[in-house]
UniProtKB/Swiss-Prot annotation:
Keyword terms, alphabetized: FAD, Flavoprotein, NADP, Oxidoreductase
Reactions catalysed: 2 reduced [2Fe-2S]-[ferredoxin] + NADP(+) + H(+) = 2 oxidized [2Fe-2S]-[ferredoxin] + NADPH
Cofactor: FAD
Name under which the protein is recorded: Ferredoxin--NADP reductase
Family per similarity comment: Belongs to the ferredoxin--NADP reductase type 2 family.
HAMAP family: FENR2
InterPro entries: FAD/NAD-bd_sf (IPR036188), FAD/NAD-binding_dom (IPR023753), Fd--NADP_Rdtase_type_2 (IPR022890), Ferredoxin-NADP_redctase_2 (IPR050097)
Domain of life: Bacteria
Description of how the protein assembles with itself and partners: Homodimer.
Pfam families listed in its UniProt record: Pyr_redox_2
Entry keyword annotation includes Signal: no
EC number: 1.18.1.2
Length: 308
């Protein structure tokens, strides 16, 4: 299993239910993937059974399901050799591979203004503990789900201004409605940052109205940048795996163009796919069942846990 985000962790658990021995390789230093890295406090609302659950609690529950699976963190997969089986980085010999890397290796898109080392200390691209910003004046730059979630979370403990280059936000409809109803968040739209300097331990940022000449000045103790991430799953192309618009192409069994290599979650793409965790959980079951049928064609496979 390559990737220890929610979908990868669930796939490892489901593989265990079928008696498969699994090793999970994760490039980050801790499991949980992008949800745990970017917004562990976020309430996830679209996972069946839970009316809401935080990313951190979801990770804890998924980890609690693991028993004899080996979890290796801080290991970025680079090499793959194919003989009768697969050999990963000259160390792990496996019969099948499931790629569950989400958007792959990701780097935050940087704040567009040149920052001195002193200014960099006030610029953040992710955080785990909201209390670090309590009582401060916070600027959040971005207009997607992450920016909206951060704004609503921090508005409970800080003075928050959300700056976006458009009047419309890209987040989920319910998040946009909640934001507009949250009188604790000051909205600055449509504005882009024009210049920045540090004065008396704070960031002074000039904001220019998009399509106009108006320039305003804002002072922040800290800013959070949610301009998205540059994702990269191209490492699998070195293995001969086909990509489609940057995503791993799969068939109906979640198998890639290379027999024995499967892809699930946001790492893969096919017509009509929706990038939500719940879909990834279903894809994990499809991939594991396909692997079982490939490795043990003589077995009568129990498809689901409620089979009689």
């Amino acid at each position: 299993m390559i990737g220890a985000g929610p979908v990868g962790l669930f796939a490892a658990y489901f593989a265990h239910l079928h008696g498969l021995k699994t090793v999970i390789l994760e490039s980050l230093n801790e499991p949980g993937g992008q949800p745990e890295m970017l917004y562990p406090f976020k309430k996830i609302l679209d996972i069946p059974v839970f009316n809401e659950i935080t990313a951190a609690d979801l990770t804890k529950r998924l980890l609690a399901n693991l028993t004899d699976q080996d979890l290796v963190t801080g290991h970025k997969v680079s090499q793959l050799e194919k003989t009768d089986e697969f050999v990963i980085d000259g160390e792990y010999q496996v019969r099948s591979i499931i790629v569950a890397t989400g958007n792959g290796a990701f780097k935050a898109k940087k704040f567009p203004l040149k920052a001195t080392p002193e200014a960099e200390d006030h610029i953040h691209y992710f955080f785990k503990n909201p209390d670090l910003f309590a009582g401060q004046k916070i600027g959040i730059f971005g207009g997607g789900d992450t920016a909206l979630d951060w704004a609503q979370e921090l508005s409970q403990i800080a003075d928050v201004t959300l700056v976006h280059r458009r009047d419309q936000f890209r987040g989920m409809e319910s998040s946009v409605e909640n934001l507009k109803a949250d009188q604790k968040v000051t909205l600055k739209t449509p504005y882009l940052p024009k210049s920045m300097q540090v004065e008396k331990g704070q960031l002074e940022i000039s904001l220019k109205m998009v399509g106009g000449d108006e320039v305003t000045q804002e002072t922040f103790d800290q800013i959070l940048v949610a301009y998205g991430f540059r994702a990269d799953n191209r490492f699998v192309s070195k293995w001969g795996v086909d990509l489609d618009q940057g995503l791993i192409a799969v068939d109906r069994s979640m198998q890639t163009s290379v027999p024995g290599i499967y892809a699930i979650g946001d790492s893969c793409g096919y017509p009509g796919r929706v990038p939500v965790i719940g879909i990834g959980f279903g894809e994990a079951q499809i991939a594991v069942n396909a692997i079982m049928q490939d490795l043990f064609p003589e077995k009568s496979l129990t498809i689901h846990s409620t089979s009689i």
